[in-house]
Amino acid sequence: MNRAELHVHLEGSVEPETLLELDASLTREEIAAATSYSDFAGFLKSFVWVNQRLRKPEDYARVARRLFERLESEGVTYVEVTLSAGVVLWKQQPFVPVYDALAREAARSPITVRWILDAIRQFGAETAKPVFELAAERVGDGVVAVGIGGDEERGPARWFADLYRQARDRGLRLTCHAGETTGPASIWEALAIGAERIGHGIRAIEDRALVARLIEKDVPLEVCITSNVRTGAVTSLAEHPVKRLWDAGVPIVLSTDDPALFDCTLASEYDLAARAFGFTQEQLAELARNSFRYAFEQVGAVGR
């Protein structure tokens, strides 16, 4: 079945083989050690380590090309790739050459590719401003949305209320990581600043009023099952609330988050939903339809 991928981080898609191509001094053992972690804080360190291997626009382009090829092989026809623009700026890399290289790769791909620029929430709103500005400048040129990721506890969504309002006024769609490693209050804050989709959001299951609000407002959760298990956001696969959220009527889209770091694919996430949680083929088909329904660019998604 055709699917769309709505929550995948470019920098989290870098396979070990690609890292070896980017840095010939690395060994597989070093890569394995650097990308091993036991909790969310450790995962963030691994994510930063991979980011630091991306030094040139051509490096980003290579990673994007490999990602698009893998997605195409899985039957993905539309993708919204999250680019950690905040990390690009933190590394003091010029953003324009990086984005231009990515845009060229996207244009070559048979998949429809759109971009979500992501700011680092724990760095604060002032540091996020340039990311939001870069996103607004590229509305209509591949960028469809802006969001915040990173450490929820050290970067609450309310800090970004003004930036989200300004982004919406400039034509950007809005997403926000929330309810991944912290409780329902984080999701309430994301909704309060205007988030139209919630990255992860699995802790919503703890708050009946929040579940009702998500249903009422038709705000989908971008659920990444393997990611949540690997980072310790849930204590075990059996404890993951994806099926309970689905049964309650919460809109859900399945995604991979960081497929290379979590050793998963979009196809394997659908298979996992069926195998571990009893999603039927009809329900999997509905999840696939959701992936297009909740895309930020309907023309590009529905047209595929």
Sequence positions of predicted segments:
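Glycine-rich beta-to-alpha transition loops that act as phosphate-gripper elements at the mouths
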Residues: 177-182
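Metal-cofactor-binding active-site regions of metalloenzymes
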Residues: 1-172, 183-186, 192, 196-197, ...
